Amino acid sequence: FTFPYRHTVFDNSTNDIIANEIKTICLKYGTGYIRLPKQDFIRVGQGSYSHGVACNYLYKRFLQSGGGKYFGLLDHDIFPIESFDVSIFLEKQFFYGLRHRFYIWPGFFFVRMKEAAQKNLDFRPSLWLRGDTGACNAYSLFKGIDFVRYELVSEEKRNFTQEGDIFDNGYSYFSCGWVHCWNASNYMGKNIDKKWRECSAFLKK
């Protein structure tokens, strides 16, 4: 990032050992860390809903009153590989990120706080819209938006080899110089050891 920023990890882990490992890494590198409350009311297998509820909580509890000019949400397996200045986009338009049909996916999501504060943000998925995490923002933040009029991220999906799919052998390259490695939590139940060796080597280049 070339624009001044504050990076905080909002940890939605259910495993205490993993959460402590994440916290230790954050403390080592001076990154903010907040452990989110457990979501005992959400059934196993509802990962998108859990993600949306977590985003709603952290926005209303921390970001809404945080004093920032902008805020952004990043998935846990997305990394910048080029210099990035979000203000280039947010000075021209009130949001930027990766479009999923009628909304911006909250794994790569940036918005001006001024406009966000005027809307009822809701990052939950929508069964009615058949949308993933963040789809409910189509009813508020992005209602009536003609996305073709905005500059947004384009995504190119790539595989390390011709074997497998993006979940066990691939990643996405974003036009703004970011990489989404996919399936870091292995919610798809794949053998991802080789993939993560490839990803680590790729990111270190």
How would you name each of these model-derived features?
Residues 15-68:
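Active-site-proximal specificity loops/subdomain of glycosyltransferases
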Residues 71:
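Short aromatic/hydrophobic "clamp" motif used to bind/position activated sugar donors
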Residues 48, 78-143:
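Conserved catalytic core of nucleotide-sugar-dependent glycosyltransferases
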Residues 36-46, 102-103, 155-163:
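A short acidic, often aromatic-flanked loop/helix-cap motif at beta-alpha or helix-coil junctions
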Residues 132-205:
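C-terminal catalytic/acceptor-binding lobe
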Residues 1-5:
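Short, acidic, metal-binding catalytic loop of nucleotide-sugar glycosyltransferases
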Residues 11-13:
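Acidic ATP/Mg2+-coordinating residue in the GHKL
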Residues 6-8, 148:
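A structural signal for isolated positions on well-ordered beta-strands in alpha/beta enzyme cores
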